[in-house]
């Protein structure tokens, strides 16, 4: 395993892929804890479909993908919050409404213009190895911003996650914090789509948090454990992808599934002991 990892890091494109992927995995895991506890974990899936629609339009218009997708997905995140808070359409229904609409727009755009070319396929199924240097630099900068914002707002995110009503009563601007979480999630989804694809990006948000919750009981413990699990599973998944010539996104998800099963079994044994 060590020799395999050394061989991986001997290639510049693999180093770039691992650095970007590890940062995206870390961001997704940290945000995932709050989203899972707030029963909003499928927002990643919904926003990824919006991202696919935006990337399809960018490809058709010959626009740099991230420059169009980031603002569009952020706008979709705000729209999701507004629909969820101010209408009778709640939670998963709001996500399904926006995601299916955006996915349909993306599919129609692809059909009428470029067709299912390599870029569209990469955005749908993921291909972290196709990251350009410019995409990698932008992804690293955006990931650093997400991590910094999460650390700075950690106490408020904790308060809003567990008891939004009490958080409002103590002076926390809950709506603003929810908006920040939505924006950070949107940015993470967009930069993560290149690695995982629109079909699998939500797994980076859901699996590490659920796995950590099998063995940890405090919010801080779950956050730290989730972050470690996410990065470790990513590295192992990339190594498996490299060794067995598997799609990187699918390999990473399978490793996360194995980790979830192992932690669930460990929690069961601990409960019976």
Spans of model-derived segments:
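C-terminal binding/interaction regions
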Residues: 2-10, 124, 128-129, 229-266
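Transmembrane helix-bundle core of multi-pass membrane transporters
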Residues: 4-7, 11-16, 95-155
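Loop-to-transmembrane alpha-helix initiation sites
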Residues: 17, 66-73, 92-96, 140, ...
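Alpha-helical transmembrane segments of multipass membrane proteins
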Residues: 30-34, 56-57, 78-82, 107-108, ...
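Short loop segments and helix-boundary regions at transmembrane helix junctions
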Residues: 33-116, 212-224, 241-244, 268-270
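Helix-loop-helix "hairpin" substructures at the membrane interface of multi-pass membrane proteins
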Residues: 135-208
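Membrane-interface capping segments at transmembrane-helix boundaries
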Residues: 155-156, 265-273
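Transmembrane alpha-helical segments in multi-pass inner-membrane proteins
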Residues: 201-250
């Amino acid at each position: 395993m060590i020799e395999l990892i050394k061989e991986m890091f001997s290639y510049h494109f693999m180093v770039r892929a691992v650095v970007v992927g590890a940062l995206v995995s870390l961001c997704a895991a940290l945000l995932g804890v709050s989203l899972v506890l707030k029963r909003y974990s499928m927002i990643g899936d919904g926003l990824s479909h919006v991202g696919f629609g935006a990337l399809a339009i960018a490809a058709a218009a010959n626009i740099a993908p991230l420059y169009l997708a980031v603002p569009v997905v952020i706008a979709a995140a705000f729209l999701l919050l507004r629909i969820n808070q101010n209408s009778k359409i709640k939670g998963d229904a709001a996500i399904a409404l926006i995601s299916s609409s955006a996915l349909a727009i993306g599919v129609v755009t692809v059909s009428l213009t470029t067709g299912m070319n390599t870029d569209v396929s990469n955005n749908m199924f993921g291909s972290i190895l196709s990251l350009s240097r410019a995409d990698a630099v932008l992804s690293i900068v955006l990931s650093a911003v997400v991590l910094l914002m999460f650390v700075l707002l950690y106490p408020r995110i904790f308060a809003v996650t567990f008891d939004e009503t009490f958080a409002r009563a103590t002076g926390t601007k809950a709506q603003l914090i929810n908006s920040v979480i939505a924006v950070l999630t949107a940015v993470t989804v967009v930069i993560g789509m290149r690695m995982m694809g629109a079909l699998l990006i939500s797994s980076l948000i859901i699996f590490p948090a659920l796995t950590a919750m099998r063995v940890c009981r405090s919010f801080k413990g779950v956050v730290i454990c989730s972050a470690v699990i996410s990065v470790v599973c990513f590295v192992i998944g990339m190594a498996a992808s490299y060794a067995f010539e598997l799609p990187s996104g699918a390999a990473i998800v399978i490793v996360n599934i194995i980790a979830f099963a192992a932690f669930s079994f460990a929690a069961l044994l601990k409960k019976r002991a």
